[in-house]
C-alpha cells in the first residue's frame, strides 16, 4: 500500500466514524472524494500550509459538492489544520464542523459551499482574480457528476475557456450512471 492509499483509507475511516457519530450525513459522496483529496493534499499537487491557512501564496481548493464536507474535514485534520479529535463533533450544535463547510469557521476551507452548481463559478472567479493579479497559484475545484447538469457549471466552464484560465483545475467525480443512462426506452 502506498502512502497516498494509506492516507485515503485513513480518511475513509474518519469519514465513517464522523457520520456514524453524527447520525446523519452523506457517506457515499464523502467516501468517493478520499483518493482525490489524498493526491491533492499529500501528493505534492496542492501548495498549502496548515500553519498559515490564509497564506497568500497558497493554492486554493474548493469543494463544490459541499455535502461531502466530512471528506474535506478529514483531509484538513490529517494535514494539521485542526485536531483530529474534533472530527467527532460533526453536525453537533455549536461545533464549527457542520454539514456543509463554512469558510468563516474552519481553517483551510476556502469557500462556504453547499448549493450544487456554484463551486466551479466561484473557482473560475478566484482563478481569474489570481491571473489578473499576475499570481501563479492554481485553483482546484472538486465537482460531483450530478451538479454538472446545472447550467451555471457550463457557463463557468465557458468563462474559464474564454479567459484562458490555465490556473483552474476542475476534478469531476463520476460515481455512477444516472437513471437516464440506465433507461431501456
Where are these regions (language model features)?
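N-terminal capping segment at the start of a domain
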Residues: 8-24, 173
Amino acid at each position: 500500500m502506498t502512502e497516498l492509499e494509506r492516507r485515503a483509507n485513513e480518511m475513509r475511516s474518519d469519514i465513517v466514524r464522523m457520520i456514524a457519530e453524527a447520525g446523519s450525513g452523506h457517506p457515499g459522496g464523502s467516501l468517493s472524494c478520499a483518493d482525490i483529496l489524498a493526491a491533492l493534499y499529500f501528493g505534492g499537487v496542492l501548495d498549502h500550509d496548515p500553519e498559515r491557512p490564509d497564506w497568500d501564496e497558497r493554492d486554493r481548493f474548493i469543494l463544490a459538492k459541499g455535502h461531502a464536507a466530512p471528506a474535506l474535514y478529514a483531509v484538513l485534520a490529517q494535514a494539521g489544520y485542526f485536531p483530529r479529535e474534533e472530527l467527532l463533533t460533526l453536525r453537533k450544535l455549536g461545533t464549527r464542523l457542520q454539514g456543509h463547510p463554512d469558510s468563516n469557521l474552519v481553517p483551510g476551507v476556502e469557500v462556504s459551499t453547499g448549493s450544487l452548481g456554484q463551486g466551479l463559478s466561484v473557482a473560475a472567479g478566484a482563478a481569474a482574480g489570481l491571473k489578473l493579479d499576475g499570481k501563479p497559484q492554481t485553483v482546484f475545484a472538486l465537482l460531483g457528476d450530478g451538479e454538472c447538469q446545472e447550467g451555471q457549471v457550463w457557463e463557468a466552464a465557458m468563462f474559464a475557456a474564454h479567459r484562458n484560465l490555465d490556473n483552474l483545475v476542475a476534478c469531476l467525480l463520476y460515481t455512477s450512471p444516472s437513471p437516464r443512462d440506465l433507461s431501456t426506452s
